[in-house]
From Swiss-Prot:
Species whose genome carries this gene: Synechococcus sp. (strain RCC307)
Lineage: Bacteria, Bacillati, Cyanobacteriota, Cyanophyceae, Synechococcales
Listed name of the protein: Photosystem II extrinsic protein U
Bilayer topology term: Peripheral membrane protein
SUPFAM superfamilies per record: PsbU/PolX domain-like
Oligomeric form and interacting partners: PSII is composed of 1 copy each of membrane proteins PsbA, PsbB, PsbC, PsbD, PsbE, PsbF, PsbH, PsbI, PsbJ, PsbK, PsbL, PsbM, PsbT, PsbX, PsbY, PsbZ, Psb30/Ycf12, peripheral proteins PsbO, CyanoQ (PsbQ), PsbU, PsbV and a large number of cofactors. It forms dimeric complexes.
One of the record's GO cellular component terms: photosystem II oxygen evolving complex
Cited HAMAP family: PSII_PsbU (MF_00589)
Amino acid sequence: MSRLFRRLSTLLLCSLLVLGVWLTQPLSVQAAEIRNKVDDKIAETAGKVDLNNASVRRFQQYPGMYPTLAGKIVVGGPYDQVEDVLKLDLTERQKELFEKYKENFTVTDPEIALNEGFDRINDGQYR
């Protein structure tokens, strides 16, 4: 019985030690552990549509771009700069539309968490 009591006591003390170390970390360290790459990527774009990481649905706010031109942009990446979109096989009307809205776009490095699978084409949001 005393052997069992010692083991349980040791386990409890170790658990408390680990919990104590975790709780005494500065909040900034804890927050850094909770943040993920997607949160960082969203913060990096400053409200603009990231051409290398956005889904086609992000283009709905720009009349005429969704779904055809948005699909071409999403599939045609990755891009080094916003103007690289104009190298795609676009109609004159699509080029005009892109020029009209290009100040609303930005380019960051592609993030695997945002580009995996077909989520950029169909991100599963339905009305």
